[in-house]
């Protein structure tokens, strides 16, 4: 059985078991609408490759992410590469800017860890949700 944090017990989310998939999820609330709360300067300062961070992406992480995507039949190349790789390139070109607090937090973690992260607005999406490796014939929106 997959790990599901206690906070998520009321959310319909399944995380399928797969040897390459190590998914985690959490729910958070923000004190105000994201459009009215700009990201703090300390967070924006993390959106560059030279920022101090407790973790660092490396080739092993990038290879593992690509291997997982290929296991589902996805070709992580060109415009379809993992978002974490796009963030690394954009930050290196000083083209990564603030969007909102939720996205900026996840982008900063993704940039420095190399792990792809998704943000889902539960006020705009409805479950059940599934995290898993795509099966033949599945289609999905990526990036």
Regions found by a protein language model. Give the residues of each.
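Charge-biased, low-complexity intrinsically disordered regions
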Residues: 1-143
